[in-house]
Amino acid sequence: MSQYFTLFRIEPAFDIDTENLEQTYRALAARFHPDKFASASAFEQKQAVMMSSTINDAYRTLKNPIDRAAYLLKTSGIDADAPEHTAFAPEFLMQQMEWRETLMEARAGNDLESLKNLDNEIRDEQEKLFCGLKQSFARQDYDTAAQQVRQGRFLDKLRNEISSAL
């Protein structure tokens, strides 16, 4: 199941060398680009398209810290997006409501400064979450990591909403 890590010759871990990921991606994408197989057999062309698709999927997954964490959990048999991991701690739920309220008010008032401040706050929360994920994986505390992935998905979604409003 650690196929993506194997493809990129990376040790399965949350904390990876993203520069190495990028370089390996470029090399793999160039090597298996479907255009290089234009004069090959139909079978080889199909294989190149499938390989190119797998490379792109793997890169997108490993590049995004939350997707990488979810994928890493799956390699350990834990589905972070399963219903049993959807509950949030009461403190995080309260914080979610505050952030949503701030976002609604800033949108309604077309307050770009508040939106930028909220975006900075959420980015800082994401950085803290990534540090927490690193620690959870180091301790092999996969239940906590699964909850952190769900929190990270919320933060990603909220930042996307903020970006749309800016």
UniProtKB/Swiss-Prot annotation:
One of its GO terms (biological process) is protein folding. SUPFAM superfamilies: Chaperone J-domain, HSC20 (HSCB), C-terminal oligomerisation domain. The keyword Chaperone applies. Keywords: Chaperone. Residues 3-75 form the J domain. Pfam families: DnaJ, HSCB_C. It comes from the Bacteria. GO terms for molecular function: ATPase activator activity; protein-folding chaperone binding. GO terms for cellular component: iron-sulfur cluster transfer complex. The keyword Chaperone applies. Disulfide bonds: none annotated. SMART domains: DnaJ (SM00271). HAMAP family: HscB (MF_00682). Co-chaperone involved in the maturation of iron-sulfur cluster-containing proteins. Seems to help targeting proteins to be folded toward HscA. Interacts with HscA and stimulates its ATPase activity. Belongs to the HscB family. This is Co-chaperone protein HscB homolog. It comes from Neisseria meningitidis serogroup B (strain ATCC BAA-335 / MC58). The lineage of its organism: Bacteria, Pseudomonadati, Pseudomonadota, Betaproteobacteria, Neisseriales. The gene is hscB.
